[in-house]
Amino acid sequence: MTETNTQKPKNRAVLVGLWAYRLEREENATEESMEELSDLLKTAGGECVGTVLQQKDAPDPRTFIGEGKVAEVRELVRAMDADMVIFDNSLSPSQQRVLGEELKVQVLDRSALILDIFAQRARTREGRLQVELAQYKYLLPRLLGMWKHLERQEGAIGTRGPGETQLESDRRHIHRKIAKLESELKEVRRVRATQRERRIKNEVPVVAIVGYTNAGKS
């Protein structure tokens, strides 16, 4: 008997952008930047299933886009069976957390998407370390969003137990990981500098192949 795989494809994303008068020009989302975001999503292996671009006077400090647009995005997520929402603009950790709670799916911004692409394409040890370090630094202030199901308990009398302990444990773990990665990066760069000095001292020629992407340099 032939089995049919009915599981939906992963990384179906609704893309959201805001153009606001009170944002700097480079901070605003435009039709062109939204198209670029869609291309980035494809590069990362995802699929754009809908876009929402809002224009308003200023970002909402809580949800970045207006409450009405949040409801519109929520309905679009449901209608298109999306499993994530990606913002073209940068979100604060608190905005990302609130939006995740409101939309009931993973919420990312352009920075997180680009870091994911870098992680996929990093080939050298130094490159992989740099991307991992950037990802941990991006994650650290957003940890509370991952533990939002414990947020009601945090700080309450009689609840300073497993939930808050785990959150602090994760923070300490990431701080240690960041310190370790920074140390490893420093060592990699030291070794590379030493090797470069040795090549120069020994007059070893350096050869570089130059050409366009996909021009057959490999």
Task: Please identify what each model-predicted range represents.
Residues 1-110, 114-116:
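N-terminal accessory targeting/assembly segments
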Residues 112-134:
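Short alpha-helix plus adjacent loop in nuclease-associated cores
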Residues 59-60, 112-113, 145, 152, ...:
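Residue-level signal for pocket-adjacent positions within structured domains
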Residues 37, 85, 136, 174, ...:
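Residue-level signature of catalytic and energy-coupling elements of molecular machines
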